[in-house]
Design a protein with these regions (language model features):
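Compositionally biased, intrinsically disordered low-complexity regions used as flexible
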Residues: 1-3, 505-506
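Bacterial N-terminal signal peptides that target proteins for export
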Residues: 2-14
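Bacterial N-terminal signal peptides
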Residues: 12-24
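Generic N-terminal helix/loop capping motif
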Residues: 19, 26, 60, 92, ...
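Cleaved targeting-peptide boundary
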Residues: 28-33
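Mobile, glycine-rich extracellular loop/lid and propeptide segments
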Residues: 36, 41, 46-64, 114-164, ...
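A post-motif C-terminal structural segment
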Residues: 43-48, 57-112, 159-557
Length: 557
């Protein structure tokens, strides 16, 4: 893995930690090992601009993904040896995220700020605080200046962040109006999720897809169709072949290997948009936020890594157009109050334990729901979900069989260590590698055992999940003096939530909220105008700096 100098790395991340007002530009290395030097401010306006937005991706989310990669190789982090491309870009800063009416923002207001350079109130997209005046966004500015435009997201393409770059509505939930504005927009390339309400909320309105096709869009729904796209394809709406019930792209942890990744979509967008006109492309990792709302660390890490691989595709493009390109990576807000550290694990992180999780909390919850449909409350048995628990998270109860397997694994380790004394040279090196792997496997085997308190917590969560089979109380108005909302499971499937929570804690991860937080988020950049992105700024300034780097007006008319 290529590294940057420790002195420079300390400076860059100290700037983030203490919120200094300036930070030095430093050289990173690209995927091929080529040094990425700061771009001269004397360069002409950026011809190609790619803005990456990790929805809900705070500093903790980025470092969790970075440290996870180290942990998976049984390595301690090294000074300056950041694993994520976004963490190695030469300009690093922070942006505040508050909205016009709240310290803790939400995605519509934050997306509007990043798209228009103006503050907005909650739940509005592309309009001012009066909810009557449209505010010009970067996509519209870019088109007015002759550039091509692309908008991508792993959320539904009419969700808050992507919609902020082409729509103007007083309510972010007005999906039908947003979809119609997509059809009427001048955006050249859309990709990612589908449309939530193409026939309106009641399903009785005219199908917006017909308007989209009539507007000249080529609509793709398969990986094969996506592969055929190129500069000759004209305007494109590429809908991912695997969508969930919310019309968003399935989580990376649940994605089938044959389905396109966010990096694949980004590579295709760059191929379709590249040309003499230049372009502005916004790429959102929209479901980092969703995973963090669920306090699902393993899924959030994989979503962050998926976004970083998309950034790497943009970096390859940058290396071919160094003096004409600007890449910016930021977030609309942090979600979940993620903490790299938990009281029970003290000063230790065990992020490699997150690798035991094989499905998102949402998929696990669906499997629990499916089980519940086959039982009555009186016949549901905790033991019947233990195999699912193991398959999903690696967590197991302490059984005689597991105890015996752990004892055998420990005995094998002792024998392996003894055998090392009689080996030399290459044979010893190979045996030491095998011994190290065996130690990791043994540690994982022991760590994944449910402690008595954890087992009881899982049983309580199972009971809470199965109680949904019981008739609802007839009372319609709870006594306010007696009613207390149950925040234990965040409104999600209790069995799934508790399983993921226990795994998080075993990894040394904790969460402070099921909602957004007000902490500033990282801003990273490379290319034309990169130095302007260092230090502490506001999210509205991110838009203004991008517009300035592109040579666009920011008058908001």
């Amino acid at each position: 893995m290529n590294v940057i100098s420790s002195r420079v790395a300390r400076r860059a991340w100290l700037a983030l930690a203490v919120l200094v007002l300036s930070a030095p530009a430093w050289a990173a290395e690209g995927p091929s090992g080529e040094a990425l030097q700061p771009t001269s401010h004397k360069a002409p306006p950026a011809k190609y601009v790619i803005l990456f937005i990790g929805d809900g991706m705070g500093l903790a989310q980025r470092m969790a993904a970075d440290l996870y990669m180290d942990a998976m190789e049984s390595k301690l982090p090294q000074a300056g040896a950041f694993r994520l491309v976004m963490n190695r870009l030469p300009a690093q800063g922070l942006a505040t995220t508050f909205g016009a009416d709240a310290v803790i923002t939400e995605s519509a207001a934050a997306g509007t700020a990043l798209a228009t350079g103006r503050k907005a109130v909650k739940s509005v997209l592309g309009v001012d605080a009066s909810k009557t005046k449209a505010m010009t966004n970067l996509s519209e500015l870019a088109k007015a200046n002759g550039r091509k435009v692309g908008v991508m997201s792993t959320a539904s393409i009419d969700h808050a962040t992507p919609a902020a770059f082409y729509a103007h509505v007083a309510r972010r939930s007005d999906y039908y109006s947003i979809a119609r504005q997509l059809a009427a927009s001048k955006v050249d390339f859309f990709a990612g999720g589908g449309l939530k309400q193409p026939k309106g909320k009641d399903g009785r309105k005219s199908d917006v897809m017909k308007e989209i096709e009539a507007a000249g869009f080529t609509v793709c729904r398969t990986a094969e169709d996506l592969a055929k796209l190129g500069p000759q394809s004209g305007r494109v709406l590429a809908i991912h072949p695997s969508l969930d019930s919310e019309k968003s792209v399935v989580y990376e942890i649940d994605r089938k290997s044959e389905d396109p990744s966010l990096a694949d979509l980004t590579r295709k967008a760059l191929q379709c948009l590249e040309g003499p006109e230049g372009f502005f492309l916004m790429v959102e990792g929209g479901k980092i936020d969703w995973a963090c709302h669920a306090n699902d660390a393993a899924t959030a890490v994989r979503e962050t890594l998926a976004l970083d691989r998309a950034v790497q595709e943009a970096l390859k493009f940058y290396l071919r157009h160094k003096d004409e390109t600007l890449i910016v990576v930021t977030a609309d807000h942090e979600t979940g109050g993620l903490s790299l550290g938990y009281s029970a694990t003290g000063y230790k992180l065990h992020l490699e334990r997150l690798a035991a999780q094989k499905m998102s909390l949402g998929v696990l919850a669906k499997k629990v729901s499916d089980y519940r449909k086959t039982r009555k409350y009186e016949t549901a048995r905790f033991e019947e979900l233990l195999d699912l628990l193991k398959d999903a998270t690696g967590l197991v109860p302490q059984t005689p069989e597991h105890k015996a397997a752990a004892a055998k694994a420990l005995a094998d380790l002792v024998e392996q260590e003894k055998a090392l004394k009689n080996l030399t040279g290459k044979a010893r090196e190979e045996a030491e590698d095998d011994f190290d792997d065996a130690k990791v496997e043994y540690a994982q085997m022991v760590a994944m055992v449910l402690a008595p308190a954890e087992l009881e917590a899982m049983k309580r969560a199972f009971d809470a999940s199965m109680k949904k089979l019981l008739p609802k109380p007839k009372t319609t108005t709870p006594d306010p003096a007696k009613y207390q909302p149950d925040l234990s499971y965040g409104g999600r499937e209790p069995f799934a939530v508790e399983a993921i929570r226990i795994l998080n804690h075993k990894a040394g991860i904790n969460w402070g909220s099921y909602a957004h937080t007000g902490i500033p988020v990282p801003v990273s950049a490379i290319g034309v105008g990169e130095k302007t992105f260092t230090g502490l700024c506001d999210n509205t300034h991110v838009q203004q700096k991008i517009a300035a780097a592109m040579g666009l007006t920011t008058d908001g008319k």
